[in-house]
From Swiss-Prot:
GO biological process terms on file: feeding behavior; neuropeptide signaling pathway
Entry keywords, A to Z: Amidation, Cleavage on pair of basic residues, Hormone, Secreted, Signal
Keyword Signal: yes
Entry protein name: Pancreatic polypeptide prohormone
Post-translational modification: No icosapeptide-like peptide is cleaved from the C-terminal.
Amino acid sequence: MAVAYYCLSLFLLSTWVALLLQPLQGAWGAPLEPMYPGDYATHEQRAQYETQLRRYINTLTRPRYGKRDEDTAGLPGRQLPPCTSLLVGLMPCAAARS
């Protein structure tokens, strides 16, 4: 029993440490917004900030391709006829016709 308690506590402790040591960006994959250098920054600092800001905006707004590009979301490719039942919303159209 003591060994099981020791293993469980070691597992929980290591999980807690792993969660605390995660990088700020890595968990969700979104980049961090660059820090504004201030009103009295040099031209080089402002140029670097603008470059980082442009990269940040391009990363967040880039088009995504693949499965997310489909508009159907798994629905059939044909148009279904409209339901003329009085019970629309209470039962599916197929059940109302039979």
